């Protein structure tokens, strides 16, 4: 706007008749009356007419416009919200949550495989005809009953396993202990990392997981039965690079139940054949 006025004012002044009074209406809303007069002494004959210069009032108006620039632009309306940004990096693992509620009973499973053969008892020898009216016999020793019970227990099914972890694991996954040392009964599967019960009874399980640290993180390891956590252990990387997470349980298992160790965040050290991380269990006594 100021630039247009600076150009328009001189043009208006040039268009006015020389020596005549004129009026100017400027942007400052004031009227200026300033006649243009010829130079003293007139012009010599034959001299080329010179355009009149701007008046003093016009110069004052132009200086006033230069000193007071037009107001700034009016702020427009608020724009629409921008597009959502990209997802941020994945945060560290959170603390283990509490166990969930017990689920409803599952459907009845298929019939199990035939059980192991029972104990073979030897036939007793026939006794002679007793004497009528004989006296009472001497009481037997209770040690024989205890020995018989222990014999029946230890002569039952033999189920035990002891396995180690060769390759490292991290994140949230079932630990597949692939270094099998003992697997009586072949109830442990190294391809899945799970122990599958085939004989109902009371079992003992224990696990020891070495954390692969050095970056200030922690590791959680849970022993699960059919997806439900039955024991948990944590290892923290405080002042050292390695720490152990260990725990043990005694569980009653039915045929078809599965027991395994699940990593719930962190890094587990494998150790090739050194067996730094192990998982073992055995049958205490069958039902």
Curated annotation (Swiss-Prot):
UniProt keyword annotation of Secreted present: yes
SUPFAM superfamilies, A to Z: TNF-like (SSF49842)
Signal peptide interval: 1-21
Residue stretches of biased makeup (Pro residues): 84-104
One GO term (biological process): neurotransmitter receptor localization to postsynaptic specialization membrane
InterPro entries: C1q_dom, Cerebellin_Synaptic_Org, Collagen, Tumour_necrosis_fac-like_dom
Domain Collagen-like: 76-118
One GO cellular component, as annotated: collagen trimer
Record key words, sorted: Collagen, Secreted, Signal
Molecular function in Gene Ontology: identical protein binding
Positions of the UniProt region annotated as Disordered: 42-127
Subunit annotation: Forms homotrimers which can further assemble to form higher-order oligomeric complexes. Interacts with ADGRB3. May interact with ERFE. Forms heterooligomers with C1QL3 and C1QL4, when proteins are coexpressed; this interaction does not occur after secretion.
Its biological purpose: May regulate the number of excitatory synapses that are formed on hippocampus neurons. Has no effect on inhibitory synapses.
Protein name: Complement C1q-like protein 2
Originating species: Homo sapiens (Human)
Lineage of producing organism: Eukaryota, Metazoa, Chordata, Craniata, Vertebrata
Gene that this polypeptide is encoded by: C1QL2
């Amino acid at each position: 706007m100021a630039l247009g006025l600076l150009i328009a004012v001189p043009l208006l002044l040039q268009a006015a008749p020389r020596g005549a009074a004129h009026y100017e209406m400027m942007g400052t809303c004031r009227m200026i009356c300033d006649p243009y007069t010829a130079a003293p002494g007139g012009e010599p004959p034959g001299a080329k007419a010179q355009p009149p210069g701007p008046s003093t009032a016009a110069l004052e108006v132009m200086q006033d416009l230069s000193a007071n620039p037009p107001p700034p632009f009016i702020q427009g309306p608020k724009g629409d919200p921008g597009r959502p940004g990209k997802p941020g990096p994945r945060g560290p693992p959170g603390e283990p949550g509490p166990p969930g509620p017990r689920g409803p009973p599952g459907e009845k499973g298929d019939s199990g495989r035939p059980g192991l053969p029972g104990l073979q008892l030897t036939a007793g020898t026939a006794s002679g005809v007793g004497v009528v009216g004989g006296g009472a016999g001497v009481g037997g020793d209770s040690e024989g009953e205890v020995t018989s019970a222990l014999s029946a227990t230890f002569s039952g099914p033999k189920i035990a396993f002891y396995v180690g972890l060769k390759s490292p694991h991290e994140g949230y996954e079932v630990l597949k202990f692939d270094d099998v040392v003992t697997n009586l009964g072949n109830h442990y599967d190294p391809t899945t990392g799970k122990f599958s019960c085939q004989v109902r009874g009371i079992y003992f399980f224990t696990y020891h997981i070495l954390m692969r640290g050095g970056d200030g993180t922690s590791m959680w390891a849970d022993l699960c039965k059919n997806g439900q956590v039955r024991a948990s252990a944590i290892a923290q990387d405080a002042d050292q690079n390695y720490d152990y997470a260990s725990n043990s349980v005694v569980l009653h298992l039915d045929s078809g139940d599965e027991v395994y160790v699940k990593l719930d965040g962190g890094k587990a050290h494998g150790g090739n054949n050194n067996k730094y991380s192990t998982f073992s269990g055995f049958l205490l006594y069958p039902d």
